[in-house]
């Protein structure tokens, strides 16, 4: 990275357990070092970059990615806001501190706007700051089914602002029927995005199959008509911890059939989504 040496000289990385050098961890096909967001100077450096390189350039939200903090040296040392601590004790907290730093930068830059952020990684509490998704899923009917169930579990666990990469992120492109069904399912989730890096070098796009484009358009139009409802659900989730995606048994526990294996779910209390 062009600014790696600068950051290392300023001591903004998590440090190796045996030296004061930055820790080195495997990243993709090489090595890298992780920023230490328990160091106030790191937070300030990050926020300056978010502001000058993104927000001032017209990009008004942040996608906090590759933030699992897979530091292989569990004893690697973190600043700990003045009380040094090993990364193994606070690993899940690091992405939370990262997204909070991004949130604060956006709030300071545009205090009149409600900030929108995404994070790939995190833990309980991340719903205070960001929207998230199920990660790099693979194109298949099974993925569509199990992503839906994963989203319900996340919603019941407090991570209510969730969704999945519609059509699958990796693998070959979806066929027309799978793509339509995935879009129809996806528009009923808090996060709806068609996002891909297909193995066959194609790109998932709403118009990729002209024969089903009208069905795709209809589903997306429904999404826009439901925006006031989504807005209300998001407020209720924020204020009262109300799950946006709800297994049918959550509101109908006296109906034994709702406990049978089923892919249907409720969007809020009032819309039943047949899957």
For each predicted feature, which ranges?
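Catalytic-domain carbohydrate-binding cleft regions of carbohydrate-active enzymes
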Residues: 1-275
């Amino acid at each position: 990275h062009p600014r790696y040496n600068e950051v290392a000289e300023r001591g903004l990385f998590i440090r190796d357990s045996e030296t004061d050098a930055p820790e080195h961890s495997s990243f993709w096909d090489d090595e890298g070092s992780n920023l230490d967001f328990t160091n106030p100077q790191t937070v300030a450096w990050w926020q300056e970059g978010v502001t000058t390189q993104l927000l001032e350039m017209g990009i008004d939200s942040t996608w906090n990615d590759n933030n699992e903090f897979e530091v292989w040296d569990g004893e690697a040392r973190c600043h700990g806001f003045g009380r040094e601590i090993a990364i193994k004790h606070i690993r899940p907290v690091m992405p939370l501190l990262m997204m909070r730093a991004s949130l604060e930068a956006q709030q300071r830059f545009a205090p009149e706007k409600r900030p929108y952020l995404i994070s790939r990684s995190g833990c309980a509490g991340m719903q205070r700051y960001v929207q998230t998704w199920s990660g790099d899923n693979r194109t298949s009917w099974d993925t569509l089914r199990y992503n839906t169930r994963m989203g319900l579990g996340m919603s019941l666990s407090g991570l209510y602002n969730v969704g999945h990469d519609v059509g699958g992120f990796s693998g070959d492109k979806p066929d027309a029927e799978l793509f339509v069904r995935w879009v129809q399912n996806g528009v009923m989730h808090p996060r709806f995005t068609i996002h891909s890096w297909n193995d066959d070098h194609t790109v998932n796009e709403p118009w990729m199959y002209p024969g089903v484009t009208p069905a795709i358009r209809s589903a997306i139009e429904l999404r826009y008509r439901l925006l006031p409802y989504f807005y209300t659900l998001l407020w209720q989730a924020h204020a009262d911890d109300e799950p946006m995606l709800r297994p049918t048994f959550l509101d109908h526990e006296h109906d034994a059939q709702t406990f049978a294996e089923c892919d249907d779910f409720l969007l809020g209390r009032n819309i039943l989504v047949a899957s």
